[in-house]
Amino acid sequence: MKSTFLWTACVTPFNCNGDSIDYSSLQRLLTMQVKAENGVVLLGSTGESLSLTDSEKRTLVEFVCKLKLNTEIIIGVPGVNLYQTLEWLDFCKGMPIHGYLMTTPIYAKPGIMGQTLWFEKLLEKAHVPVMFYNIPSRAGINLHAETVRNLSSHEKFWAIKDSSGTVDTLAQYKKVAPNIEVFCGDDNMISDMAAYGAAGLVSVASNVWPYVAHEYVKKCLNGRNPQADIWQQACEALFIASNPIPTKALLHDIGLIEHQTVRLPLSTEDLPSVEKLRQVNKMILGWKELATL
């Protein structure tokens, strides 16, 4: 896992009416990630995992594993019901995957010990390295620094994806658990978080721009910051509506997925316009410093 610094939080393409997964489009996206040498995260919030049935999630993981992709695969682990989550880990144990992304329990807002005991249960079941996911905007609470400290010596606890939106949280995690890698979870924060010791990026933008994202993150991690304003403008455009609505709209517009469909409660009608997305796509493709890609 040490060599992968960019992980793409993959969208889950659907057919036109949204009642099934479009596996042809999914395979096309995954092939691009392999060529760009990016790792893959399946069934996260960008992948609309909460909108998928258990059967759909299992079928998707089986499909991707059968492709035998030449890249590392991380599977999202929900933070809702403990027993269903443990069953999910039992299923994944039989799959040739490389890691888990475990979300801070959502809605319940557990304290330090609640989080610690929750993750202990999951770490005991995990057969591959685990990345915790700090996403307070969705979970309603931060992954506590004390929770990280409590679990930092566990052999399966490998990394944290931090989507707090501030470098202060990353600094806290690095202070209490210097052995745990911290990945930036917000595309527009990677240049700042790289300067504070981030190990890389878990990206939404790399769904659309896998090669550019790979090169940009590499430069940030090497202490360079090529025209960060261009990257930030592009990333902000991908969040003009709830993720992954804009990303799917742009992927469809440029012909990488057949349909921009999302599942309720998300709706494509909440996207103001695709024009802004077209503008930033043109800007990224004309990015002179990365034009060799």
From Swiss-Prot:
CDD domains given in the database record: DHDPS
Q: What processes does the entry annotate via GO biological process terms?
A: diaminopimelate biosynthetic process; lysine biosynthetic process via diaminopimelate
| Catalytic activity, EC | 4.3.3.7
Its annotated compartments are:
Cytoplasm
Entry superkingdom: Bacteria
Just give the chief location class: cytoplasm
**Which keywords belong to this entry?**
Amino-acid biosynthesis, Cytoplasm, Diaminopimelate biosynthesis, Lyase, Lysine biosynthesis, Schiff base
Q: Which residues cross the membrane?
A: none
Asked if the keyword ATP-binding belongs to this entry, the reply reads no
Give the UniProt entry's GO cellular component terms: cytosol
Q: What is the active site of this protein?
A: 133 (proton donor/acceptor), 161 (schiff-base intermediate with substrate)
Listed InterPro entries? Aldolase_TIM, DapA, DapA-like, Schiff_base-form_aldolases_AS, Schiff_base-form_aldolases_CS
**Which SMART domains would you find in this protein's record?**
DHDPS
**What reaction is this protein's catalytic activity?**
L-aspartate 4-semialdehyde + pyruvate = (2S,4S)-4-hydroxy-2,3,4,5-tetrahydrodipicolinate + H2O + H(+)
Q: Where is this site: Part of a proton relay during catalysis?
A: 45, 107
Pathway of action = Amino-acid biosynthesis; L-lysine biosynthesis via DAP pathway; (S)-tetrahydrodipicolinate from L-aspartate: step 3/4
* Residues that hold pyruvate according to the record: 46, 202
Q: Which GO terms describe its molecular function?
A: 4-hydroxy-tetrahydrodipicolinate synthase activity
What Pfam families does the annotation carry? DHDPS
Q: What does this protein do?
A: Catalyzes the condensation of (S)-aspartate-beta-semialdehyde [(S)-ASA] and pyruvate to 4-hydroxy-tetrahydrodipicolinate (HTPA).
Q: Which HAMAP family match?
A: DapA (MF_00418)
Q: How does it assemble?
A: Homotetramer; dimer of dimers.
Q: Which family is this sequence assigned to?
A: Belongs to the DapA family.
Q: What is this protein called?
A: 4-hydroxy-tetrahydrodipicolinate synthase
Species the sequence originates in = Wolbachia pipientis wMel
